[in-house]
UniProtKB/Swiss-Prot annotation:
Family: Belongs to the CTP synthase family.
GO biological process: 'de novo' CTP biosynthetic process; pyrimidine nucleobase biosynthetic process
Residues holding ATP: 14-19, 71
Binding site for UTP: 13, 191-196, 227
Catalytic activity: UTP + L-glutamine + ATP + H2O = CTP + L-glutamate + ADP + phosphate + 2 H(+); L-glutamine + H2O = L-glutamate + NH4(+); UTP + NH4(+) + ATP = CTP + ADP + phosphate + 2 H(+)
Gene (UniProt): pyrG
The name this protein goes by in its record: CTP synthase
Residues at the catalytic site: 383 (nucleophile), 520, 522
CDD domains given in the database record: CTPS_N, GATase1_CTP_Synthase
Renumbered residue ranges of the record's region Amidoligase domain: 1-270
EC nos: 6.3.4.2
Pathway: Pyrimidine metabolism; CTP biosynthesis via de novo pathway; CTP from UDP: step 2/2
Record HAMAP family: PyrG (MF_01227)
Quaternary structure annotation from Swiss-Prot or TrEMBL: Homotetramer.
Length: 557
């Protein structure tokens, strides 16, 4: 039978519940347990697909095409279990399901209320999510409850967790509460009162936490832990200090050293073998002792909010581990490139243009792509970054000066990137789309396997085929491909059924490393293995860096 660990948060948001939950899962998995994770989001949106990156950060896409919270990306990076649609749900989905049942008459004329109908539905979603785990029936399902204790939006989820714990009985569920212990500089001390009040609020709901994870910018002294223990009624050994670390991959060892996994296993009456965190130690060792160093410029419009590119940043870190290369990421505002030119790019070892939506900043990205192509600087374009690379090539090499995407210019006669007219909705149904259609749940989403053209750089990187995740509405227009190929561009991978371009590259006779991909490879990168595309990209950046390095006196050029 699956046992449950509920992870809640208090005082403020963004303390790192997702990292804490994923780190605990990694430790339990290293002890031989089958583990899955779920994220419950209290907002009323059906999913984060139409939410602004400034509001929500990255939208992580699962293998089966769900647009989910970025924490699911952390889950997949920390454990081997793949996430699915059922691993993330929102208040919007819960109410949508309950209202659909009410309209069908499933409640037999009863008054539909938050308790029991909404809370029962939440419990059903949790159990369904755990049962759908790709690892088979999990020994432990870790459930992260979004939001902060005290928020009105979170109350139904916390009540459902309380009811579920009561229904399942002792040793079947436990609660981990993550809270803030701030350092007040004027007083010169850590303050435990916010944590005390947060636990008090949780206990008012009927939940007594078994473990407290106390976030601070430094290690919490034992006397402060004892004070927190006394006021929160949590054993002192279960008051665990979680201080700021320079890498999230140090957190599993930090939590294990303080006995978190032992406390959880004791509470749930689990008897797995000892933890083996050598893989995490090896990864941290690689991260901290690189042999080389490169600087990669990420040209985008959300550069002030790096949460928007969370998986991409982590994918570059994974590549750095597996190539012994420190990767410095410089975030470059594409609108500044539009107004100030490409001078800010000239010291870079490689250029990356990530995915995105909307017209703002696109001409700056195109200018950066033109610079990378002409200066022979390694270039990787992802999703929109590939589409803009095709537009730049069409304009500046093929000679279609007004080439554009219909996303940015409906009137352009040279629609080298355009909206395709048939989509799959959230339930997998084929649906015709137009420019006026709703935005939510109407993109090409999820994993798709496609063959790779033999003899290409893509084949060197991936092998015979590629299986990656998508999130986009627009495609490279096949009508212009013959002209692009005549100019030298190579379409190195296509979808097997729709024959849509998935990868493009320039031959080495034109450029040493210039690749665009319509999919999002960052979603499948893990610290365990890295990702072949990002490893190849970092290696190309290193080769460029070494080629540009000045030759020392006495050395042969």
């Amino acid at each position: 039978m699956t046992k449950y660990v509920f992870v809640t948060g208090g005082v403020v948001s963004s303390l790192g519940k997702g990292i804490a939950a994923a780190s605990l899962a990694a430790i339990l998995e290293s002890r031989g347990l089958k583990v899955t994770l779920l994220k419950l989001d209290p907002y009323i949106n059906v999913d984060p697909g139409t939410m602004s990156p400034f509001q929500h950060g990255e939208v992580f896409v699962t293998e089966d095409g769900a647009e989910t919270d970025l924490d699911l990306g952390h889950y997949e990076r920390f454990i081997s279990t793949k996430m699915r649609k059922a691993n993330n749900f929102t208040t919007g989905q819960i109410y949508e399901s309950v209202i659909r049942k009410e309209r069908r008459g499933d409640y037999l004329g009863k008054t539909v209320q938050v308790i029991p109908h909404i809370t029962n539905e939440i419990q059903a979603f949790i159990e369904r999510g755990a049962a759908s785990a790709t690892c088979g029936e999990p020994d432990v399902a870790i459930v992260e409850v979004g939001g902060t204790v005290g928020d009105i939006e979170s109350l139904p989820f916390l009540e459902a967790a309380r009811q579920m714990s009561l229904r399942m009985g002792r040793n079947s569920a436990c609660f981990v509460h993550l809270t803030l212990v701030p350092w007040v500089a004027t007083a010169g001390e850590l303050k435990t009162k916010p944590t005390q009040h947060s636990v008090q609020k949780l206990r008012e709901i009927g939940i007594s936490p078994h473990v407290l994870l106390c976030r601070a910018d430094r290690r919490i002294p034992d006397d402060e832990r004892a004070k927190i223990s006394m006021f929160s009624n949590v054993p002192e050994d279960a008051v665990i200090s979680v201080w700021d670390a320079d890498s999230i991959y140090k957190i599993p060892q930090m939590l294990h050293d303080q006995g978190l996994d032992a406390i959880i296993c004791e509470e749930l009456k689990l008897t797995p073998h000892a933890a083996d965190l050598s893989m995490w130690s090896d990864l941290v060792e690689k991260l901290e002792h690189p042999k080389h160093e490169v600087t990669i410029g990420m040209v985008g419009k959300y550069v002030d909010l790096t949460e928007s590119y969370k998986s991409l940043i982590e994918a570059l870190r994974h590549a750095s581990m597996h190539t012994s290369t420190k990767v410095n990421i410089e975030y470059i505002d594409s609108e500044e490139v539009e107004t100030q030119g490409v001078e800010s790019l000239k010291h870079l070892d490689a250029v990356l243009v990530p995915g995105g939506f909307g017209r703002r900043g696109t001409e700056g990205k195109i200018a950066a792509i033109r610079y990378a192509r002409e200066a022979k600087v390694p270039y990787l374009g992802i999703c929109l970054g590939m589409q803009l690379a095709v537009i730049e090539f069409a304009r500046d090499v093929v000679g279609l000066k007004d080439a554009n995407s219909t996303e940015f210019d409906q009137e352009t006669p040279n629609r080298v990137v355009a909206l395709i007219t048939e989509w799959y909705d959230r339930e997998g149904r084929v649906e015709k789309r137009t420019e006026e259609s709703d935005l939510g749940g109407t993109m090409r989403l999820g994993s798709q396997r496609c063959p790779i053209k033999p003899g290409t750089m893509a084949e060197e990187i991936y092998g015979k085929d590629v299986n990656e995740r998508h999130r986009h509405r627009y495609e490279v227009n096949n009508r212009f491909v013959p002209q692009l190929e005549a100019g030298g561009l190579i379409i190195s991978a296509r979808t097997p059924s729709e024959d849509l371009p998935e990868m493009m590259e320039l031959p080495r006779s034109m450029h040493p490393w210039f690749v665009g991909v319509q999919f999002h490879p960052e979603f499948t990168s893990t610290p365990r293995d890295g990702h072949p595309l990002f490893k190849s990209f970092v290696e190309a950046a290193l080769a460029h860096h070494e080629a540009q390095a000045p030759v020392a006196v006495g050395e042969k050029a």
